[in-house]
A protein has these predicted regions:
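A short glycine/serine-rich beta->alpha loop
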Residues: 5-8, 97, 136-137
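Residue-level detector of alpha-helix boundaries and kinks
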Residues: 7, 27-31, 80
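Alpha/propeptide regions of enzymes that mature by internal proteolysis
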Residues: 13, 22-32, 38, 42, ...
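A short, surface-exposed helix-loop junction/capping segment
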Residues: 19-31, 156-164
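Flexible, acidic active-site loops/lids enriched in D/E/S/T/G that coordinate Mg2+ and/or position polar
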Residues: 35-119
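Acidic beta-strand-loop-alpha-helix segment within the catalytic core
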Residues: 109-166
Length: 166
């Protein structure tokens, strides 16, 4: 059986395709249209991948938005013994309103774990913090943005030539 990291390219591709699909609708002023484009792109990509994935945490029930639904199975290798079963937490388009209004900070969100390892939370909105392992003990959702950035910079300074601010 493979390790979860062996499947990463399929999930990266799914988030990229979802991001591109909704980015093409930035400024369309229709939240559901942008969200549906991201959902369709992500679902199609994952349904055609040689994976055994299940949505453990999804988004959509709260606000009746288009969604990958909890319990939905994705992939061409469902229930195969030679494939690692994977649970996903997913929101194909986080901040749909921002995308529809051509505002910043919309993103595609996905987390992976071996089957059964994701905490099953009730439908609720959550804060998200995305870092590499390098920052695991450095930043926290309990910190202000300024504090988190300052602490991150103390671990790994960012070269000014790498910064592409707006």
């Amino acid at each position: 059986m493979k390790n979860i990291i062996d499947y990463k390219d399929y999930f990266i591709r799914a988030t990229e395709y979802a991001a591109v699909a909704c980015a093409q609708l930035r400024g369309c002023e229709d939240n559901n249209k942008a969200d549906q484009a991201a959902v369709n792109a992500m679902r199609t990509t994952l349904m055609n991948a040689p994976i055994d994935a299940r949505v453990a945490i999804g988004e959509g029930e709260i606000d009746e938005a288009p969604m990958l639904y909890i319990g939905e199975k994705l992939g061409t290798h469902i229930d195969r013994e030679d494939v690692l079963p994977i649970d996903i937490a997913v929101d194909p388009l986080e901040c749909t309103k921002n995308c529809a209004n051509d505002d910043p900070n919309a993103m595609t969100v996905m987390a992976l774990s071996p089957k059964g390892d994701l905490f099953r939370a009730p439908d609720t909105y959550m804060n998200k913090l995305v870092t590499s392992r390098l920052f695991k003990d450095v930043v926290s959702l309990d910190f202000s943005m300024e504090c988190a950035l300052s602490r991150s910079y103390s671990v790994k300074p960012m070269a000014s030539s790498n910064f592409k601010g707006s």
